[in-house]
Amino acid sequence: MRHPVDMPEKVGTDAKRLFAQPEHLWELTLTEASALVRHRRITSRQLVEAWLSRIADFSELNAFISVDAAAALKQADSYDHYLEAGGDPLPLGGVPIAVKDNIQVVGFANTAGTPALSKFFPTCNARVIEPLLKAGAIVVGKTNMHELAFGTSGYNTAYHIPGVIGVRNAFDHSCIAGGSSSGSGTAVGALLIPAALGTDTGGSVRQPGAVNGCVGFRPTVGRYPVDGITPISPTRDTPGPIARSVEDIVLLDSIITGALPAEVPAAESIRLGVVDQLWADLSEPVRKLTEDALRKLEQQGVQIVRVSMSEIFEMSHAVSMPLALHECRSALTEYLSANETGVSFDELVAGISSPDVRTIFEDYILPGRLGELEGQSVDLEQAYATAMKDARPKLIQSFEFLFKEHQLDAIIHPTTPDLAIKSNPAATSFEAFARMIRNADPASNAGMPGISLPAGLSQQEGLPVGIEIEGLPGSDARLLSIANFIESILGRGPTPTRSGVESKISM
């Protein structure tokens, strides 16, 4: 198998674009930056300095929990010297990336966004990190997140600059950045870093990608290793990348998996299902932009098939919370012990800072209850057993039947039904959480891959909208190739400007 660095520049990629230098180096995509360093047009130090400066200029976003500038610059200098000495270039050689703070990276604390783990410095990297480091990537910092990954707002009361709580949106600093990979989303969207890793249980890579105007990819569960990642639900969890282009996502995926990318398909060969239920009850800006995107694809020859899954939300609800709430306790307990964190499960829970996350643990996970039904407490263990035995297989079979019956490559829908909401305690409500995950959660519960792409900016609010495609488990290569085609029609995501957003930040 050929290593990505040995391949010729991507078919269809404009060489002039790859080697063109923008006014600011932090405007480069991951692919562009790696090409410029590889061909000695710029140095790794220049790149790292540019993005470190950008990170410092946008501290009000609360995008990072930790940054190690000295170590990053030392690695950059080392790589520059390596190339000067005639070393063979690496696929990501000398290019900075960021990593969500629940994915272990040696040299950084792995807090999972919670105070009890603030002093936990792992002795080994998460397995998904290893191929990226071997490819020459430089981890400059760990990104902020919804505490313990249990939410979609990024309103983390433990890690923030003075006076500004919550990870903030790249396009409007008064709004949320999505979650739980909040910092990874806003860091890429605000051009603080060209790419970042996050984790996705029910939309936690795709939502931050969508609301920050970038691309977020959730692979099939099991495609990327999860060793060394603070868990929620082993059945549903997966790491995934966020970047500014599908090209960058494909590059990262090929490095992590060692697989060569699939050819970009012809429009006429693509069949996308529009599930009615996932297009209902949308906010007007989301509806307009995503319907416009669908029309553009259809005009190019993509086959759009209208389909229905009348019980999609009911089936998903029967799986989603039972799995996350029940699996969390045992998975976290095992993780804390196996990775020698020095913190017990009880100590972890006692230190939770964010009120919404504390409520989840104290009212549901610790007592082993799912809630109430007709005045009676619902036993969590029984709900989990039912979900695994009946509800999840039914959901998976329903997707398989839909794809087979209509000969679909993927389904397509708005990533989130609404624009990013204001960043405040109300953003942590269960109602806000349920609304944010509504469209991305069902396929997550079936272990399916999905990728969110930018569909444009809302006209009045100036906020990004995402459109997502999801395929059956194992269809990642085909899904990424379709995403490449879609991006060629819709264009890449917008770039935020600082003018007009500084005054919006809620202190």
Curated annotation (Swiss-Prot):
Protein name, per record: Mandelamide hydrolase
Q: Which reaction does it catalyse?
A: (R)-mandelamide + H2O = (R)-mandelate + NH4(+)
Source organism = Pseudomonas putida
* Consequence the record notes for mutating residue 202 to A: Increase in KM values for aromatic substrates, but not aliphatic substrates. Active against lactamide but not against mandelamide
UniProt keywords (A-Z) are: Hydrolase
Tell me the function of this protein.
Answer: Hydrolyzes both the R- and the S-enantiomers of mandelamide, and phenylacetamide. Has lower activity on 3-phenylpropionaide and lactamide. Does not hydrolyze benzamide. Hydrolyzes esters and amides with little steric bulk. Preferentially hydrolyzes aromatic substrates.
Task: Write down the EC number.
Answer: 3.5.1.86
Instruction: List the Pfam families.
Output: Amidase
Q: By its UniProt entry, which PROSITE patterns does this protein fall under?
A: AMIDASES (PS00571)
Under the heading PANTHER family, the entry gives: GLUTAMYL-TRNA(GLN) AMIDOTRANSFERASE SUBUNIT A, TRANSAMIDASE
Q: How is its activity regulated?
A: Inhibited by 3,4-dichloroisocoumarin and PMSF.
Name the enzyme's class: hydrolase
Induced by what? By growth on R,S-mandelamide, and to a lesser extent mandelate.
Name the protein family.
Belongs to the amidase family.
- What does the record give under GO molecular function? mandelamide amidase activity
